[in-house]
């Protein structure tokens, strides 16, 4: 996501955010990273984050979550990483809960998380249904 990063202006030259998409920064972040010669990170918090209960991440409905998933699905086939895959899987499960639509994910035999193990056993559609059923009884607060 774009909000917690510092960029050189020239990285954005020729790039545009997609019109009409929520989470639009997720669509161009891979392109920005591909233009970088160096990426530096720090574990030190350098700003104060404000959790906006009315912000897009807290109020995202089906269309917004679908936009987020589609942005990640463009990148997922190129990024062979179990942790990233588990995050995208969680987004796909959220999209199903909000829309009832199953969006196919590329097949990887990851088994880092319980959800990934269950995905490999029963498939995405049944995992979506199971996840939604379980959330009727148990849901972590966001």
Language-model-detected regions and their locations in the chain:
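Membrane-interface aromatic/basic loop that binds lipid-linked glycans or pyrophosphate carriers
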Residues: 100-142
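Extended hydrophobic/Leu-rich segments
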Residues: 61-62, 83, 118, 137
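Structural motif
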Residues: 78-86, 122, 142
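Amphipathic alpha-helical repeat scaffolds of TPR domains
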Residues: 86-95
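Catalytic core of nucleotide-sugar-dependent glycosyltransferases
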Residues: 46-52, 58-82, 101-109
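Alpha-helical elements of Rossmann-like donor-binding domains used by nucleotide-donor carbohydrate transfer enzymes
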Residues: 31, 70-74, 91
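Conserved nucleotide-sugar donor-binding catalytic segment
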Residues: 1-60
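Active-site catalytic microenvironments for nucleophilic, acid-base chemistry
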Residues: 35, 78, 98
